[in-house]
Curated annotation (Swiss-Prot):
Protects virus-infected cells from TNF-induced cytolysis. Keywords: Early protein, Host-virus interaction, Inhibition of host caspases by virus, Modulation of host cell apoptosis by virus. It comes from the Viruses. Pfam families: Adeno_E3_15_3 (PF03307). Belongs to the adenoviridae E3_15 family. The keyword Magnesium does not apply. This is Early E3 14.5 kDa protein. GO terms for biological process: symbiont-mediated perturbation of host defense response; symbiont-mediated suppression of host apoptosis.
Amino acid sequence: MEPDGVHAEQQFILNQISCANTALQRQREELASLVMLHACKRGLFCPVKTYKLSLNASASEHSLHFEKSPSRFTLVNTHAGASVRVALHHQGASGSIRCSCSHAECLPVLLKTLCAFNFLD
């Protein structure tokens, strides 16, 4: 055993943690850029734009988690002296979309799948 065995082992573990953090940061940046580039007919009301998204990826599975907290929206419009009040209540939703592939390029497909959900509106 070499004299700096413990030091070398600690350095190896720190390098592994650093590499994992770098990969996670890269995935977050890729997700953020794909969300910004996403364009569909729903515009700003698309689940891709309105939900909080996070990505978990391993070598054999990718998982896109989405979450939206409950919210209330009230709009008052006055037309010809009469006011119309619209109150919308969203109960919130959360879930995940999983892909069991080994390709790193499936994130756009996961986002398109989330966009296609009609029950999330």
